[in-house]
Structures are given as structure tokens and as C-alpha cells.
């Protein structure tokens, strides 16, 4: 896997923002040191997704932050993103690895130790585990217990990122879980002051992540 910092992983969501506002939010988050950005767009046409990904990559490249594309291997390759993140409904992990090659980052969503171990064996570079807390972004997502998160981090040799309802107020929950970082959606994308929120999250994470001192 490419040298990748997963500490504060922004996963985008458009909500009701127009494109200019959406891009400005991503830029503010990057300027204030999120460490990775995942572009997640479920409703756009392929052409629209490609064009948006190009614009987002201009921002992430400016700040030298890796861009990960959610689900779409074709979009990842078309814009030369750093990698792709897949879930249960996408291509199998091994097939995705074959398509993107050995050098791009492959993230995989998982909820159990068994699927986590299988994903790593098939070529995953990092795992996204959750939803740890209830989340409006994926309202029907089953909650993954902290005990399961700890069991996964203990069983796999790749970095694990906690996702789902993660907020500044609950970051302390992740102390001593073995995670490499947290993936955050609404806490950043809907923050009234994104710069302040990202800085506050980075400060709180220093007390939570053993590699963030």
C-alpha cells in the first residue's frame, strides 16, 4: 500500500449543497489537514461523477492529500485517483485488486472478523469498520460493537478505520481500540466552521490514536 495517513478521513456527502459550496467545503477540510478524502456519490451519472471527481482531485492534489473514489473502479482509473473503496455490493475484493493493479489503495468495508480477514487475504490495504454509531448517512446500517472493532484490529495486519456516526464528542470511545483513524461525514461536511471543526478533531485525535502525537 502507498504510504497513507488514515487518521482523519473525510468521506464526502453533498446534502443540499450546490457544487461550488460542496467543493469549497472539501477545500476547507483539506486546507486544515484532513489526511484523506473519499468522494462518495451514489446518484450521479457516470459522466457527472467523472467531471466532479476531476474537480475534487484538483483540490486534493493541491494539498497533497490522497483521493479515494467510493465504489467506482472506472472513475478511480479515469481520474487517476489514489485508490477505491468498496463495500458488499461492489465487485469482489480480489477482482477489484486485479483491475486497479498493485499500486493503488484498496479500502474495503467490513463488519465482522471473518469478512475482515477474507478482505485482507484478497488484497485490501485498509478496512473501514462500522457503522460504530447510528448514522443518518446510512440510516439502515447495522451498528458494529466496539468489541468487534477491537477484535478486527487484533486479527488483521492492515490499518483499520472506524466509520459511522463518528463525532468529536465520541472520539474518546476509540482509545485503545487499535484503529489507525476515523472516517467522518456529517461532522465535517455540515459543520458551520469546517476549519475550526477539523482542527478540533485533529486535537482530540492526538489523545486517542497512539500514532498521532
From Swiss-Prot:
4-amino-2-methyl-5-(diphosphooxymethyl)pyrimidine binds at residues 38-42, 70, 109, 138. It is an enzyme of class 2 (transferase). Binds 1 Mg(2+) ion per subunit. The keyword Nucleus does not apply. InterPro entries: Aldolase_TIM, ThiamineP_synth_sf, ThiamineP_synth_TenI, TMP_synthase. 2-[(2R,5Z)-2-carboxy-4-methylthiazol-5(2H)-ylidene]ethyl phosphate binds at residues 135-137, 165, 185-186. Condenses 4-methyl-5-(beta-hydroxyethyl)thiazole monophosphate (THZ-P) and 2-methyl-4-amino-5-hydroxymethyl pyrimidine pyrophosphate (HMP-PP) to form thiamine monophosphate (TMP). This is Thiamine-phosphate synthase. It comes from Lacticaseibacillus paracasei (strain ATCC 334 / BCRC 17002 / CCUG 31169 / CIP 107868 / KCTC 3260 / NRRL B-441). The gene is thiE.
Amino acid at each position: 500500500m502507498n504510504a497513507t495517513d488514515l487518521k482523519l478521513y473525510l468521506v464526502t456527502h453533498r446534502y443540499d449543497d450546490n457544487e461550488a459550496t460542496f467543493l469549497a467545503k472539501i477545500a476547507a477540510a483539506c486546507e486544515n489537514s484532513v489526511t484523506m478524502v473519499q468522494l462518495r456519490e451514489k446518484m450521479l451519472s457516470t459522466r457527472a461523477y467523472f467531471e466532479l471527481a476531476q474537480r475534487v482531485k484538483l483540490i486534493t492534489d493541491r494539498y497533497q492529500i490522497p483521493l479515494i473514489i467510493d465504489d467506482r473502479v472506472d472513475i478511480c482509473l479515469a481520474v487517476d485517483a489514489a485508490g477505491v473503496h468498496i463495500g458488499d455490493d461492489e465487485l469482489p475484493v480480489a477482482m477489484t485488486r486485479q483491475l486497479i493493479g498493485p499500486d493503488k489503495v484498496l479500502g474495503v468495508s467490513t463488519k465482522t472478523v471473518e469478512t475482515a480477514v477474507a478482505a485482507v487475504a484478497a488484497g485490501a490495504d485498509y478496512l473501514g469498520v462500522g457503522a460504530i454509531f447510528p448514522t443518518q448517512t446510512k440510516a439502515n446500517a447495522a451498528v458494529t460493537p466496539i468489541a468487534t472493532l477491537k477484535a478486527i484490529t487484533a486479527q488483521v495486519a492492515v490499518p483499520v478505520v472506524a466509520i459511522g456516526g463518528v463525532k468529536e464528542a465520541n472520539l474518546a470511545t476509540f482509545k485503545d481500540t487499535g484503529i489507525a483513524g476515523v472516517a467522518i461525514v456529517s461532522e465535517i461536511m455540515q459543520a458551520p466552521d469546517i476549519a475550526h471543526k477539523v482542527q478540533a478533531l485533529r486535537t482530540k485525535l492526538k489523545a486517542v490514536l497512539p500514532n498521532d502525537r
